[in-house]
UniProtKB/Swiss-Prot annotation:
Residues of the signal peptide: 1-24
Gene3D superfamilies: 3.30.160.320
Lineage of source species: Eukaryota, Metazoa, Ecdysozoa, Arthropoda, Crustacea
Location(s) in or outside the cell: Secreted
Keywords: Antibiotic, Antimicrobial, Secreted, Signal
A Pfam short name: Anti-LPS-SCYG
GO cellular component: extracellular region
Identification of the protein by name: Scygonadin
Tissue: Expressed in the ejaculatory ducts of mature males. Not detected in the ejaculatory ducts of immature males. Not detected in hepatopancreas, female reproductive tract, eyes, exoskeleton, subcuticular epithelia, heart, gills, stomach, muscle and hemocytes.
């Protein structure tokens, strides 16, 4: 009887530890279209620059000789201790940009550079 109780408690504790990151990932996935849209909007504004969570970022794309666009997003002043560069590639420039933004945000999230609450506040203030 004791071993089954101990096993049950172990499972509950493990679920408590494992579930939150998954939920955070799901929350970020739900917010991702809004994040990408906001940053794409900033990219399209002349002389506006790109600011994500209060950090100045660079989002750029280049057309390659093979007809594909490659895009990169970085926020050097924010991630200088652990450089993060989001990368995207597509035949469509907008899709390459979206890919680089998504890749950057997911990587920054993996390195715990922000919380979901911070992203929600940033979206609400935008």
């Amino acid at each position: 009887m004791r071993s089954s109780l101990l096993l049950g408690l172990t499972v509950v504790v493990l679920l408590g530890v494992i579930v939150p990151p998954c939920m955070a990932g799901q929350a970020l996935n739900k917010l991702m279209p809004k994040i990408v849209s906001a940053i794409i909007y900033m990219v399209g504004q002349p002389n506006a620059g790109v600011t994500f969570l209060g950090h100045q970022c660079l989002v750029e794309s280049t057309r390659q000789p093979d007809g594909f666009y490659t895009a990169k997003m970085s926020c050097a002043s924010w991630t200088h201790d652990n450089p993060i560069v989001g990368e995207g590639r597509s035949r469509v420039e907008l899709e390459a940009l979206k890919g680089s933004i998504t890749n950057f945000v997911q990587t920054a999230s993996n390195y715990k550079k922000f919380t979901i609450d911070e992203v929600e506040d940033w979206i609400a203030s935008y």
